[in-house]
């Protein structure tokens, strides 16, 4: 149906820059910022109105995490980790974490590492991702593109098994701050900033077939 949004409930605190992922029955937020870095994982039950509930914690206080999920496992990738309470002074995370969404609650566990630098402001030797597009099938999770220096690189993981991200292919252009969404078979990246010239806003929509490499 069409119509305006209706109030569902509240987060435990005012939060910006949190990651989000979901199963068929639960929605999750991970990390965020206000007034400092957060490591909370919270969840709501879609079928009931009300506020969010505490699920567990991430290994680091992090904002800007890229998140995705299949039907059972939620994945938390990258982000900017706490070094002090300035949101732009943190280090860049290459870590991938996971939770089992149907559990009664648990802290995130280590899954693997991302491939390469992907966040605005990275310097040589830093790794992480904050601004790529994410999408998933029942078996694979993908993060595409990312920050400065902007990249075309698309990375993937196999959600059911632990391990580092692997190279999937490339976008048609370098892109950061990209929106990602998917069906069970096809992942799309939309908009963002590209390098034609530097920091040009984009209206480009690209797609990949998630089950293939390329």
Q: Which residues are covered by each model-predicted region?
A:
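Polar, enzyme-active/binding microenvironments
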Residues: 1-214
């Amino acid at each position: 149906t069409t119509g305006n949004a209706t109030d569902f409930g509240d987060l435990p605190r005012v939060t910006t820059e949190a990651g989000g992922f979901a199963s068929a029955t639960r929605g999750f937020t991970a990390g965020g910022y206000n007034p400092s870095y957060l490591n909370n994982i919270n969840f709501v039950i879609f079928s009931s109105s009300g506020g969010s509930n505490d699920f567990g914690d991430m290994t680091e206080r992090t904002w800007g995490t890229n998140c995705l999920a299949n039907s059972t496992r939620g994945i938390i990738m990258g982000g900017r980790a706490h070094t002090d309470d300035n949101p732009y002074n943190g280090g860049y995370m290459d870590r991938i974490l996971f939770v089992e969404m149907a559990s009664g609650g648990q802290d995130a566990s280590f899954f693997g590492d991302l491939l390469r630098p992907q966040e605005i402001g990275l310097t040589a030797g830093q790794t992480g991702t904050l601004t790529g597009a994410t999408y998933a099938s029942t078996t694979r999770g993908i993060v595409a593109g990312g920050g400065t220096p902007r990249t075309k690189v698309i990375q993937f993981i196999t959600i059911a098994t632990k391990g580092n991200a692997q190279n999937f292919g490339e976008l048609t252009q370098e892109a950061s701050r990209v929106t990602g969404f998917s069906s069970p078979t096809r992942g799309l990246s939309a908009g963002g900033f590209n390098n034609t010239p530097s920091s040009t806003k984009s209206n480009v929509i690209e797609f990949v077939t998630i089950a293939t490499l390329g």
